[in-house]
Amino acid sequence: IALNNADVNGTKVAPFANSRDFFYGSWFTTDEDWMGKFISSETRDPLPGILGYNNAVLMENSPNKTLACDGALNYINAYRTAVPVPASACEWFLPSLRELADLVDVVSTVNTKIAAAGGEELIENGGNGSRYWSSNERPGNSYVVYQHNLVSGGISTPYRSAGSTAGVFRMMLAF
């Protein structure tokens, strides 16, 4: 997990997108060159694994990216620019619900390690600052992208474009 939340022009809490009527995670199912190469981001309970990376690739290549996930991509790209990764790792990505859920039981331990490394602890104080955007979209509802609350362990389904349900972008990478 990244040592700090992503930041764009001094802002760390933001909406996922500027529009809410588009999906980014299923376009590949009808594209002959991409068909069968990914798992749809439109799922709440993904298979175990590093699906945040899968979902980030779907976002980056989506024909709807300027509407469906522009905010998220701005934060992903800003973090990638600001924080280089080791040659043995993939690029930074926005975690899936599963990857965020895996943090809930170990958040205190993770925070201790992050603090020791001089990073920004995962927020556990409630409010928008503890709602972390996932890279999972809600099936059948183009308005919604899932968030994970590290305080309650709960999952919420806010509108991707509503400022009142803005969340934090915390990146991960895999070796």
Model-assigned labels for residue ranges:
Residues 91:
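Mobile, glycine-rich extracellular loop/lid and propeptide segments
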Residues 1-82, 130-132, 162-172:
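Extracellular adhesion/carbohydrate-recognition regions
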Residues 88:
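Conserved P-loop
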Residues 97-175:
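C-terminal, surface-exposed recognition/capping segments
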